[in-house]
Structures are given as structure tokens and as C-alpha cells.
């Protein structure tokens, strides 16, 4: 029994939800998202709530039940509040700058790294922090992971790009014999 799937999703004011067959359509202002639920999950809209239930008692239907409820909830939260991830840059000479729709990173390589910002994502650079914001949780996480991947933090000095809430396990350096 899915504990997540059982919970109804309250539709906040300003968000329109339509159900067309297996397709859930969400809209708030000029933002619109769609969620294609599989045939083995029932979706109902009752009393300003979205309810999910499995069609069968097989394992696959129960697995999709909680998954699609979580995906729909993330869409509702993304349309109303949005998602954000914060990255920190540590290291001498490491810096980031925005140039239009391109994020330019200087991370100790012989050349700057230019990262094209995808649509629907807003990036704010403030000194050594990069804030990635957007309405799609998956895309925000993916963009933050791609930026971190250019120079992941190393365990000796902690230089590199890391999430603001990430803890780096530090290692001791070499010791000399005496």
C-alpha cells in the first residue's frame, strides 16, 4: 500500500488542472506543464483535490501509483513556489559570471567554461555562489549537477564546485618521514 499515493494533492488557487484521458494538464499564468499518467493508474479530480489510485493489484500498478502522485505534486509545487539549488565555488581564482544566457565559469583550467542556460531556468550569481531556480524540479537538479560536474570538490583542500548543503569528507595529506 503506497502511503504517498494515498495522499490527495490540494489544488492551490490560481492553478488550473484538467484531465484529458491519461493526460493531466497544469496551468498557472503563462506556465504550463503536462503529466502523462500510464494506463495502470486512475486519476480523479474531486473537491479541488487530485486523487490517484492503482487500476490493478499488480506490483507495477502499485509502484506507479506513488510515483505519479509525487510527480504531480512536484509540478504543483513548481508552478506555485518553484525550486532552487545553491552551489558554492571554493578555490583561488575560481569564479562565475553571467553573460546573457551563458554562464561563464573560471575553474582553474586554461580556458573558461561556457555553459548555455536551458529555457525555464534562471541562474543568479553572487560572488562565489550560484543559485539555480526554475519550476521543474528535475531540470533544476540536472542543471546544478552539470555545473558541479565541471569541477567537483576534491577531498584535500575542498576546492571545486559543491552544493551549499553538501559536506565534503576531508582527507589528510602526505606526512613526511623524520
UniProtKB/Swiss-Prot annotation:
Pfam short name (any one): Ribosomal_L6
SUPFAM superfamilies: Ribosomal protein L6
GO terms for cellular component: cytosolic large ribosomal subunit
Gene Ontology terms, MF aspect: rRNA binding; structural constituent of ribosome
Keywords recorded for this protein, A-Z: Ribonucleoprotein, Ribosomal protein, RNA-binding, rRNA-binding
InterPro entries, per the entry: Ribosomal_uL6-like (IPR000702), Ribosomal_uL6-like_a/b-dom_sf (IPR036789), Ribosomal_uL6_a/b-dom (IPR020040), Ribosomal_uL6_bac-type (IPR019906), Ribosomal_uL6_CS (IPR002358)
Primary role: This protein binds to the 23S rRNA, and is important in its secondary structure. It is located near the subunit interface in the base of the L7/L12 stalk, and near the tRNA binding site of the peptidyltransferase center.
The protein, known as: Large ribosomal subunit protein uL6
Amino acid at each position: 500500500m503506497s502511503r504517498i499515493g494515498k495522499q490527495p494533492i490540494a489544488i492551490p488557487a490560481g492553478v488550473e488542472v484538467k484531465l484529458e484521458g491519461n493526460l493531466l494538464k497544469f496551468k498557472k499564468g503563462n506556465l504550463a506543464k503536462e503529466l502523462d499518467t500510464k494506463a495502470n493508474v486512475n486519476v480523479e479530480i474531486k473537491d479541488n483535490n487530485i486523487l490517484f489510485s492503482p487500476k490493478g493489484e499488480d506490483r507495477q500498478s502499485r509502484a506507479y501509483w506513488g510515483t505519479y502522485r509525487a510527480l504531480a505534486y512536484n509540478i504543483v509545487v513548481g508552478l506555485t513556489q518553484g525550486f532552487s539549488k545553491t552551489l558554492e565555488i571554493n578555490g583561488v581564482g575560481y569564479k562565475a559570471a553571467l553573460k546573457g544566457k551563458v554562464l561563464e565559469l573560471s575553474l582553474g583550467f586554461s580556458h573558461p567554461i561556457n555553459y548555455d542556460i536551458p529555457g525555464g531556468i534562471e541562474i543568479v550569481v553572487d560572488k562565489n555562489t550560484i543559485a539555480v531556480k526554475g519550476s521543474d524540479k528535475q531540470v533544476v537538479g540536472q542543471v546544478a549537477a552539470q555545473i558541479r560536474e565541471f569541477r567537483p570538490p576534491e577531498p584535500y583542500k575542498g576546492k571545486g564546485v559543491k552544493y551549499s548543503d553538501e559536506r565534503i569528507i576531508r582527507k589528510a595529506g602526505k606526512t613526511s618521514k623524520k
